[in-house]
Amino acid sequence: MNLIIDIGNTTAKVALFNRSEMVEVLTESNQSLDSLEALCSKYRIERGIVATVVDLNERILAELAALPFPLLWLNHETPLPVGNLYETPETLGYDRIAAVVGANEQFPHNDILVIDAGTCITYEFIDSKGQYHGGNISPGMQMRYKALHQFTGRLPLIDSNGRKLPMGRDTETAIRAGVLKGMEYEISGYIEAMKHKYPELLVFLTGGDDFSFDSSVKSAIFADRFLVLKGLNRILNYNNGRI
């Protein structure tokens, strides 16, 4: 059994995999990993992988150090099951490459665009030969709401909970429509441009932000919330024997 620990900017995901099948996944604060003890008692875990985008506090470091099985700490020197053409691998976020690996595992002989809509929106491309070319980074949903509030004098800070109109009828709905429709059109534009260059392109969407697309775009997307976890599990399996 594999233990997958994915520590993000605000939350941590802890998942258990039996080979390539996800058995259980939990989400908790990135300040502690309270579920570890119970999971270790419940399952026979043989190895684990830790991927983090933040500096870990002493409590989490102690919890991880106490685990009775080897851990792989993902970094830019970790061997990957895909080629990496990124010019600065030391600056590449683990979640970006893990999502690509997760998509490639499912369709190893296809050109793939991976879109992760989280704190930022990231666009990653891996070709049909398993070569990761890189990608783009754009502001995420909450970042857009906060920027409109912080960099203007009078626009309020709102969120996506409320009336959603195609065209705003007041300031609140105008901001909400601008953010949500802006994201929709941006993502649709990326897909259209990439499909023009790679006609057989597959598109994966992952991440925590939910938003709608028109039917023609939606039908062309594989939605997979656990793509990063699946990619981390594949990286761990690929490195079995190296830890």
Swiss-Prot record:
Residues where ATP binds: 6-13, 119
Chief location: cytoplasm
Source species, domain of life: Bacteria
GO MF terms held by the record: ATP binding; metal ion binding; pantothenate kinase activity
Pathway info: Cofactor biosynthesis; coenzyme A biosynthesis; CoA from (R)-pantothenate: step 1/5
Cofactors, names only: NH4(+); K(+)
Active site per database record: 95
Reaction catalyzed: (R)-pantothenate + ATP = (R)-4'-phosphopantothenate + ADP + H(+)
Keywords: ATP-binding, Coenzyme A biosynthesis, Cytoplasm, Kinase, Metal-binding, Nucleotide-binding, Potassium, Transferase
Major enzyme class: transferase
Binding annotation for K(+): 116
EC number: 2.7.1.33
The keyword Nucleotide-binding is assigned to this record: yes
Compartment(s): Cytoplasm
Listed GO CC annotations: cytoplasm
Residues where substrate binds: 86, 93-96, 171
GO biological process, one term: coenzyme A biosynthetic process
InterPro entries reported for this sequence: ATPase_NBD, Type_III_PanK
Record flagged with keyword Transmembrane helix: no
Role noted for this protein: Catalyzes the phosphorylation of pantothenate (Pan), the first step in CoA biosynthesis.
Quaternary structure, from the entry: Homodimer.
Homology family: Belongs to the type III pantothenate kinase family.
Name the UniProt record assigns to this protein: Type III pantothenate kinase
Organism in which the protein naturally occurs: Bacteroides thetaiotaomicron (strain ATCC 29148 / DSM 2079 / JCM 5827 / CCUG 10774 / NCTC 10582 / VPI-5482 / E50)
